[in-house]
């Protein structure tokens, strides 16, 4: 600093675990990794070698040769690769060889074969269906939904604003981790089921509630649209960075051969999430959809106390504690109202002379003072 030069210091205990400096220095130190036939994928101190071939023998020869080059490099620069932490995996659709293991050598030792390796937090499987990863993610979401339930009570529960912020931080951050990688999987419904439960907690709605209502009332875009937005964002970044490995895959993609596969570069057209959401809501055939003109805006009553917010949404979705619903669920023997008509949620607010609200469901949806007072009496 200035005219002074700092003295050399020998670090004997390496660097703290989890520090930013450690992977930065490692990347600088290993910036001249040797050329290999395999493609190298490096993130911090995780290095992955990936290659393609038409036979298992070719794969084994290529990877073993590349591992020998890496081992020589490590020995030259006083690095010691961990044989126990290094694994070999193979991805293919040939079911007859589903149990086939690769024989890849490193420093004279055969690497362990892992059929379901975890790389950067994503569990891979032989066919790259990501089913195992999505099962794990769904399990994590279920646990987090249980935590979110602690904030939900019929009388004292947190308001929708608090629940929405908590859900985005606690649940959606996990449910959408590396979403562009597995967004085209056939098993995304495993995650969607749990995210639907998250939105039910925010909106206070019941399980029979039509699914298109959940994102509208929770004021969160549908999971599929959020994943597509994440894919578009990644593709936009990859197109701008020519030094990214993904850039070449997008600008010069391999031939599209299998109809069961849906790679990211199959659909490069960016999507307007809000416009698509509005189109889907307009085409959705759900009860009382005429109440909502724009699904992307926060619906009236979002700041109401928990009990009134839940009750309001159950009238909106026509799924609540009316006798018609209770009879359908096996909780009541009769579906008749005290006025003699069949008691549905719309009957209670629109028609019933004992409980009707002046202006009906349209007035209730606006959640004005009269509507809130009516909800208090129900």
What are these regions, as identified by a protein language model?
Residues 18, 33, 45-47, 70, ...:
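Mobile genetic element proteins and their domesticated derivatives, centered on retroelements
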Residues 328-371:
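Short Cys/His-based metal-binding microdomains
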Residues 262-343:
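Helix/loop segments that flank and initiate small ligand/metal-binding modules
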Residues 1-16:
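Conserved pre-catalytic core of RNA-dependent polymerases
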Residues 14, 35, 48-72, 129:
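Catalytic palm subdomain of template-directed nucleic-acid polymerases
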Residues 7, 23-54:
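Active-site palm subdomain of RNA-directed nucleic acid polymerases
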Residues 65, 79-115:
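Short, conserved micro-motifs composed of acidic
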Residues 108-181:
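Basic, alpha-helical interaction scaffolds
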